[in-house]
Design a protein with these regions (language model features):
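ABC ATPase "signature
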Residues: 208-209
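H-loop/switch region of ABC-family ATPase nucleotide-binding domains
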Residues: 184-185
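Catalytic Walker B motif of ABC-type/P-loop ATPase nucleotide-binding domains
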Residues: 149-152
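Helix N-cap at the start of a conserved alpha-helix in ABC-type nucleotide-binding domains
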Residues: 160-162
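Conserved ABC ATPase signature
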Residues: 124-128, 132
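Conserved signature/switch motifs of ABC ATPase nucleotide-binding domains
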Residues: 123, 144, 176
């Protein structure tokens, strides 16, 4: 699903509502038939419910948001390590920190190789190009195994020559049947990679349909 529209049309706000970073005033959020949010129901979600709901979504920001003090591999294992610890605690079972970390390292190495960065595991963000940093951000989001991977203008902070390497990774994810929601200004990319397109204006979905309907 691609979300297109001019600046200020509400694209990023919609994405933030989906990821529970903003509180929607109307509507529902369902994932795989599971109701995560209903604005018509009184009360607010607890912090624990918000954390649980956010795990359904991975979010790749336009500005990478990598931790500068950690290398590439550590950027991709930090959140899964914490999640494994919290899950063990919630289930009332012992937490094997070493075993969990080993499994998360193996997963991260596989994902980083998938995005073409298998040789950069020990590098720090400052040693990478913008395109490489964005690919690390994609691998980091995938490490949490979200149901839906969201992108907020994933190429807007990149020089034109670095844009294609990120778009190639996203196309590869599409080929692997990864469910994605992409806010983008790359119209040709949206046309060719999307199964469904939403056009927004003034905070409202003005039009939606398959790419042929929207772009003709």
């Amino acid at each position: 699903l691609s979300i297109i529209g001019s600046s200020g049309s509400g694209k990023t706000t919609l994405l933030r509502c989906m990821n529970f970073l903003e509180h929607p005033e109307e509507g529902q959020i369902l994932v795989n038939g599971q109701l995560l949010f209903d604005a018509s129901r009184p009360g607010t979600l607890t912090d624990a419910q918000l954390r649980e709901n956010r795990l359904h979504f991975g979010l790749v920001f336009q500005s990478f948001n990598l931790f500068p003090q950690y290398n590439v591999l550590d950027n991709c294992t930090l959140a899964p390590d914490l999640l494994a610890r919290d899950k063990a605690k919630a289930e009332g079972r012992p937490f094997d920190k070493a075993a969990a970390h080993k499994a998360n390292v193996e997963k991260a190495e596989t994902l980083l190789a998938r995005v073409g960065l298998g040789a950069k595991l020990k590098n720090y963000p400052c040693e990478l190009s913008g395109g490489q940093q964005q690919r690390v951000a994609i691998a980091r989001a995938l490490a949490l195994e979200p149901d839906i991977l969201c992108f907020d203008e994933p190429t807007s902070a990149l020089d034109p020559e670095l844009t294609n390497e990120v778009l190639r990774v996203i196309k590869g994810l599409k080929s692997a049947d990864t469910t994605m929601v992409i806010v983008t200004h790359e119209m040709e990319f949206a046309r060719h990679v999307s199964d469904h397109v939403i056009f927004m204006a003034d905070g409202v979905i003005e039009e939606e349909g398959d790419p042929e309907q929207i772009f003709t």
